[in-house]
């Protein structure tokens, strides 16, 4: 059985609020860590979210 192409990752806020999103990414095409700007409702503004592993 083959290994799945997409894996689940956690996008954690850089504003140190503890807020995070869970999303999928294709590990074969996106080898580097994902950094994306999204809305943090605790900080009430758009901040960068960095990829971390789901524990």
UniProtKB/Swiss-Prot annotation:
Keywords: Ribonucleoprotein, Ribosomal protein. The keyword Iron does not apply. One of its GO terms (biological process) is translation. Pfam families: Ribosomal_L33. GO terms for molecular function: structural constituent of ribosome. InterPro entries: Ribosomal_bL33, Ribosomal_bL33_CS, Ribosomal_bL33_sf, Ribosomal_zn-bd. Transmembrane segments: none annotated. GO terms for cellular component: cytosolic large ribosomal subunit. Belongs to the bacterial ribosomal protein bL33 family. This is Large ribosomal subunit protein bL33. The gene is rpmG.
């Amino acid at each position: 059985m083959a290994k799945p192409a997409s894996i689940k990752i956690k996008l954690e806020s850089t504003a140190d609020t503890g807020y995070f999103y869970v999303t999928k990414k294709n590990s074969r095409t996106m080898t580097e860590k994902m950094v994306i700007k999204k809305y943090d409702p605790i900080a009430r503004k758009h901040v960068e979210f960095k990829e971390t592993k789901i524990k």
